[in-house]
Amino acid sequence: MCGDTGKHFNPFNVDKSSSPPNGQGSSDQYEVGDLSGKYGDLAMKTEVAGSFVDPSITLFGRLSIVGRAVVIHKSPVPHRWVCANIEPEGVREVKTAVATFTYPGSNIFDFHDNNKNSISYNNHI
């Protein structure tokens, strides 16, 4: 199952080969989804406790991690050991609306929600 997850979340196209060694750089020097890179790996450790605040990981907006997966790799040969999906609790309604006003006289409005309802309005003056 964990083999079905994709690569690290990397919306800023960070070149992993230019990232510092694990745990030695700032969070912006790693892929957003490379938590081991940012905070150090779990190799040769039987217990880890800590608290981390990562400004590049959000639960809302265009770069949200909701709907993505978290994967823990196991050593000595790194392989995907444990994974989970990050999903909102309960049912969440998502709506999007886009309004475009073009001078001298074109108005476009589009609305969509997760129930597949759509409203479109075009007015050309």
Where are these regions (language model features)?
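N-terminal leader/targeting pre-sequences
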Residues: 1-124
